[in-house]
């Protein structure tokens, strides 16, 4: 079963989205680090086509595919250097197969920090890239020395060198359009930014009409047309509060 990790700044709506997807009741509070240890649950992948087929075949039981959803504590600027939940937060991300960025696009006087999803995206991407850069540089020095005697690791070293160059610019690896060969070579190093990415722009309940514009802004930055990440990243918009009610009912 694949694991999807919900990642974002504090109070972006991660726990509310987790509850909606899994039918859980994890604490969702308007203060930082309400989630310290990750919440883990299972979500059904609802597919109308499956329901239609079941109806046609008169099946009594429909078995939906499932994914594991991990609600990871809020990331803050400086996490790669230990700020906030620091290394614990980053370690939790390393255990997932895909990352879901939850980006806040609503104003709430009780929640500190920016309400611009692009600012949320900037902080999250930079911290993940810096964490990967530190990991790559730590391993690369040792492996470059070893490669002088062991030519069998030359390709792996070259992949790490390419990754280092990209990360040093503060850009996640998924933006580079990682080749399948490099992805395989980098897999043993569990780099955060080699994972698949989905971005969810979370708008206010009374601002559904802003979704197309907000999604377009984030997509233009995260996966612009013609870029390496265009087909690597998907951007969705929603009001998590509304989805919590609608998706929650589907789990009843």
Ranges and model annotations:
Residues 1-109, 125, 136, 143:
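Conserved G1/Walker A P-loop phosphate-binding module
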Residues 60, 84-245:
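Conserved C-terminal guanine-recognition region of P-loop GTPase G domains, centered on the G4
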Residues 250-252:
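Conserved small/polar residues in nucleotide/adenosyl-binding loops
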